[in-house]
Regions:
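Structured adenosyl-cofactor binding patch, chiefly the S-adenosyl-L-methionine
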Residues: 13, 18-19, 107, 129-134, ...
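Short basic, glycine-rich beta-strand/loop surfaces that mediate nucleic-acid
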Residues: 58-68, 131-135, 177-185
């Protein structure tokens, strides 16, 4: 069968509301009784074990859909919009982190998310589930060479800010009110040297406790919403 799977109640509901065609929808009898909107979608009922086998996980909440393949956006078109707000991920391999970043980015009204083609998570059923369906509404683009992409799109209308724990400039002092690309590295590794050098400014998130860093999805949420605050202020 063609297409991709989406599972989980929120992820499937957003798929039904989003841009992708839903080819097939399966649910358990219990899920149909618990979730009123499923009845309107006219799903096929299947035993829970069948859905677990189909999804490859038991974390489906009794709802699985087959949808058309995810259509990635053009990274250069995203950078070219007026006053873009981009979340750029460098070597973030955990699908749960990508999903969480996408959820925060969509909630903050970001223009889109950029990920490298190699060594990074891309949109999968697990990412859609972790994003609570945000990937269905948020443009996501894949680039071959992340450092080169940043060098090509940055300029007076788009500043590139890299999140780095050792940066002297804090997020409170950074000017995030214009067109910005916020770049985040993997939690343990940080930004790669070439990507770090492609940033116009490195910014840190002030920490008041004893931990040395935050999860990448938390850091992304903080900076995205600080950018939103400055834009709306």
């Amino acid at each position: 069968m063609t297409g991709e799977l989406v599972y989980g109640r929120r992820a499937v509901r957003e798929a039904l509301r989003g841009r992708r065609e839903v080819i097939e929808l399966w649910t358990t009898e219990r899920a149909v009784r618990a979730v009123p909107w499923l009845t309107e979608a006219k799903p096929k009922q299947r035993p829970e074990r069948d859905l677990s086998e189909l999804a490859g996980t038991r974390d489906h909440q009794g709802v699985v859909a087959r949808v058309e393949p995810y259509r990635y956006a053009d990274a250069y078109e995203l950078a070219a919009v007026e006053r873009p707000l981009l979340a750029v991920l460098d070597r973030v391999t955990d699908p749960r982190n990508l999903g969480a970043v996408c959820r925060s980015a969509e909630g903050a009204g970001a223009t889109g998310v950029i990920v490298p083609a190699h060594g990074s998570a891309i949109v999968t059923p697990a990412v859609a589930r972790a994003s609570a369906g945000a990937v269905e509404h948020l443009p996501i683009a894949v680039v071959t060479n992340l450092a080169r992409y940043l060098d090509e799109v940055k300029g007076p209308e788009l500043w590139v800010y890299g999140a780095a724990g050792d940066a002297e400039t804090t997020m409170w002092k950074a000017d995030l009110g214009g067109g910005v690309a916020l770049v985040f590295g993997a939690e343990a590794k940080g930004l790669r040297p070439l990507v770090r050098r492609s940033c116009d400014v490195l910014v840190s998130i002030p920490l008041g406790g004893r931990v040395e860093s935050l999860n990448v999805s938390v850091a992304a949420a903080l900076l995205l919403y600080e950018a939103r605050r400055q834009r709306n202020g």
